[in-house]
Amino acid sequence: LAEAEQLLHLLRGRAPSFVSGEDICRQLNVSRQAVWKQVRSLRGQGYGVEGRPRQGYRLLSVPDRLYPAEIHAGLGTVTLGSRIVYLERTGSTSDVARDLARQGAPEGTLVVAEEQSAGRGRRGRTWSCPFGRGLLFSLILRPPVPPACAPQATMLAAVAVARALEKAAGCSPGIKWPNDLLLEGKKVCGILTELDAETERVNHLVMGVGLNVNQVAEDLEPGKATSLRLHGGKATGRV
């Protein structure tokens, strides 16, 4: 882990209590000057880190960003998300994931982005998402199944996203098979699975997911799409 991420992990584990500078230096094996640089780095990324003389530092808040450290903090999987590629802006997370897969990226590699300008849907449709308002990611899978079974992955993903939304956001989306999730008849999430396969084996599968989280009405196609914010009437944390 990078030094700033190690400090974040330590502060998160002790929050909301303070951690003394001496304790930080000892546990991370760094100087006080290095600790201060790490604190500044975290603050620059949007973390609320309070420092007090003779008390040390404590973590007060975390930014609504898809930082790997934030995803890993709540991740309960071993393979999925074992490697996370974070992008502020990209055309398509699936394009990035596809290139990484062809280069041999391991199964479970996750590509996330804050903003996407050329996301893909079915039948070649494209769509975009403003910075910091959606949950945009693509996952590399290498399932040991014949290509004919690969489409089942999209259905499994749709069910998984629906269950996650029920648990995290308290809403119950309907599934428009095979790859859309709807709230009140409007699209809130799209899933696109792209396959690279030979006759009898799957080389890799890229599963792209685009979830509308904090978009406002002006960000979306009228009458056809919605977001968790529009549905619930309040902003929703993305991590």
Language-model features: where?
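Nucleotide and nucleotide-moiety/phosphate-recognizing core
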Residues: 103, 108, 128-238
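N-terminal lobe of the biotin/lipoate ligase/transferase fold
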Residues: 2-167, 189
